[in-house]
């Protein structure tokens, strides 16, 4: 999904009126937002943080210094690790790492829903939608997290719902 489409989804989920126009610059199509009263903003996470502040929902950026750092870490991860990686091996490595990380967490920061969850959900959607039932079970923690985020009010919108089976079909023993 193009960054402009993600930012439009984010705007809608934040309850903002669709007044922003996005363009893309460079070979990698980095999103650009021209603000009404200042310089243009460049980059998915920069623009997303601006939209969160515009919607007066700063809690999505983290409530403590540690949580803010974790949100920033996962936003950076989204841009550096998820975007631009489309080989099946890259994605499975990413899902394996994320699965381990989410083992004891509800959300990326632990117990609070943040912008990092939203943007990572949008970034992973195109990959998760193509996983087999067996792959979804292999990455059980990612599947749990993803299913939880897609059912969070206002997040999924027009994106296809990914079906997860509640009872495991496969066991880890071979």
Swiss-Prot record:
The modification N-acetylalanine is found at residue 2. Residues 64-152 are annotated as: C-terminal. GO terms for biological process: cellular response to leukemia inhibitory factor; negative regulation of cell population proliferation; positive regulation of apoptotic process; positive regulation of apoptotic signaling pathway; positive regulation of cellular senescence; positive regulation of DNA damage response, signal transduction by p53 class mediator; translation. It holds the Pfam family Arc1p_N_like. Changing residue 73 to R: Disrupts interaction with MARS1. Residues 153-169 form a coiled coil. It is found in: Cytoplasm; Cytoplasm, Cytosol; Nucleus. Down-regulated in various cancer tissues. SUPFAM superfamilies: GST C-terminal domain-like. Keywords: Acetylation, Coiled coil, Cytoplasm, Nucleus, Protein biosynthesis. GO terms for cellular component: aminoacyl-tRNA synthetase multienzyme complex; cytoplasm; cytosol; nucleolus; nucleoplasm; nucleus. The modification N6-acetyllysine is found at residue 138. Residues 2-56 are annotated as: N-terminal. CDD domains: GST_C_AIMP3 (cd10305). Its main location: cytoplasm. The keyword Phosphoprotein does not apply. Residues 50-173 form the GST C-terminal domain. Part of a multisubunit complex that groups tRNA ligases for Arg (RARS1), Asp (DARS1), Gln (QARS1), Ile (IARS1), Leu (LARS1), Lys (KARS1), Met (MARS1) the bifunctional ligase for Glu and Pro (EPRS1) and the auxiliary subunits AIMP1/p43, AIMP2/p38 and EEF1E1/p18. Can interact simultaneously with MARS1 and EPRS1. Forms a linear complex that contains MARS1, EEF1E1, EPRS1 and AIMP2 that is at the core of the multisubunit complex. Interacts with ATM and ATR. Positive modulator of ATM response to DNA damage. This is Eukaryotic translation elongation factor 1 epsilon-1. The lineage of its organism: Eukaryota, Metazoa, Chordata, Craniata, Vertebrata. The gene is EEF1E1.
